[in-house]
């Protein structure tokens, strides 16, 4: 019950946002499921190198896009420089917020973890600006 509540609370933060950026090298189908209820018009970018045994595949992404056509989701590479996972909301606006995540998004809800807001947003600005210039992530077949 507690873990599900934490996931619902996180998804609540996704409402009424202009952008949601998720930095996580271990993405999977569950990552997409957490984003399925995002409002229309929100720009969502997953930054990942898609590593690990249960990585996201192109067919899963295609099926997700067909089932949730109003979710504006794209993916970019991280370039192998991230260990931690982050969620950035409303990047570049006065409402910008950033969260450090203890678990990978593909595992969120499976075990107890921490998601902590970091109020030192300015230190992330150049990192996020660099990520936005990275190439598109190509998912395996």
Which stretches of residues belong to each language-model region?
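PLD/PLD-like phosphodiesterase catalytic module centered on the HKD motif
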Residues: 1-3, 26-141
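Short hydrophobic alpha-helical module
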Residues: 13-20, 38, 67
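Short hydrophobic beta-strand segments
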Residues: 18-23, 46
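Positively charged, amphipathic N-terminal segments that serve as targeting/anchoring signals
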Residues: 1-18
């Amino acid at each position: 019950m507690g873990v599900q509540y934490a996931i619902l609370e996180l998804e609540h933060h996704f409402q009424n946002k202009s952008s949601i950026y998720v930095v996580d090298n271990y993405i999977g189908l569950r990552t997409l499921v957490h984003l399925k209820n995002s409002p229309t018009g929100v720009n969502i970018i997953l930054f990942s190198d898609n590593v690990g045994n249960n990585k996201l595949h192109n067919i899963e992404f295609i099926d997700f896009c067909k089932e949730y056509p109003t979710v504006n989701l794209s993916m970019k590479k991280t370039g192998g420089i991230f260990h931690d996972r982050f969620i950035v909301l409303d990047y570049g606006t006065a409402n910008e917020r950033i969260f450090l995540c203890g678990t990978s998004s593909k595992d969120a809800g499976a075990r107890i973890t921490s998601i902590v807001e970091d109020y030192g947003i300015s230190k992330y600005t150049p990192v996020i600006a660099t990520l936005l210039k990275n190439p598109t992530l190509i998912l395996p077949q």
